[in-house]
Amino acid sequence: MLPYPQIDPVAIAIGPLQIHWYGLMYLIGIGGAWWLASLRVQRFAPEWPKDKLSDLVFWVAMGVIVGGRLGYVLFYDLAAYINQPSLILQVWKGGMSFHGGLIGVLLCSWIFARRNGKSFFELMDFIAPFVPIGLGAGRIGNFINAELWGKATDVPWAMVFPTDPQQLARHPSQLYQFALEGVALFVILWLYSRKPRPTMAVSGLFAVCYGIFRFIVEFVRVPDAQLGYLAFGWLTMGQVLCIPMVLLGAGMIAWGYRREAGRAPA
């Protein structure tokens, strides 16, 4: 068993002002994605002035934060937030939904694309390779918060999390997700997108890979207490949301390549 590193969730405290690691991880993720996007933006939109990428990052960040929080409220714990709406603003305590954040990003990106005369799907293909940076940073934030831990296990790398009332050795599922949704997904998308691909192929690959990775990790992750398992004694809300994501992503890839083949000269 590995010891859980005792990390104060508050990274910086200046008087009554507290800056939490959870929030810092989101800033690091957004900043890292911004920097990587700046390396490729000229290939995607050579006509853009320098501040246009900043505008895009702002819109995407708003989609992540607002969509992620509202998605968690709607998908995972609606009753609690209806009873105490002020909890919605307490984002430093955790409670962000990837699928809600994805919906928020899609909506904000659609608005941005319309305003700037860009194809929505081409914009999604540009954004997709940078998303794992934010996902990975967010999972580290979950780990520091000692939340979203896994099931009890006897694997050598199991950990006892201080927030676990049972104090059992558990899978560090946040680190599994960091490795898959952050590192592995970034490598796959970064390498795949180095060459021109059919429209929707890169974003479709993101949807497929994320959905598969998340579906797998959910088997060792403890479901949200207020929901539990939805069916069969193992199906979680995260898995339910990933199934249409994988199917849609596969359809996007197939459609993109079929459309590209139809354009090829005979």
From Swiss-Prot:
InterPro entries per the UniProt record, alphabetical: Lgt (IPR001640)
Record's subcellular location: Cell inner membrane
Membrane topology annotation: Multi-pass membrane protein
Pathway in which the depicted protein is active: Protein modification; lipoprotein biosynthesis (diacylglyceryl transfer)
GO CC aspect terms: plasma membrane
Keyword Cell membrane: yes
Annotated positions binding a 1,2-diacyl-sn-glycero-3-phospho-(1'-sn-glycerol): 139
Gene from which this protein is expressed: lgt
GO molecular function: phosphatidylglycerol-prolipoprotein diacylglyceryl transferase activity
UniProt cross-references to HAMAP family, sorted A to Z: Lgt (MF_01147)
Transmembrane stretches, start-end: 10-30, 56-76, 87-107, 120-140, 172-192, 200-220, 230-250
Annotated EC: 2.5.1.145
Gene Ontology biological-process annotations: lipoprotein biosynthetic process
Purpose: Catalyzes the transfer of the diacylglyceryl group from phosphatidylglycerol to the sulfhydryl group of the N-terminal cysteine of a prolipoprotein, the first step in the formation of mature lipoproteins.
Family: Belongs to the Lgt family.
Protein name: Phosphatidylglycerol--prolipoprotein diacylglyceryl transferase
Keywords carried by this UniProt record: Cell inner membrane, Cell membrane, Membrane, Transferase, Transmembrane, Transmembrane helix
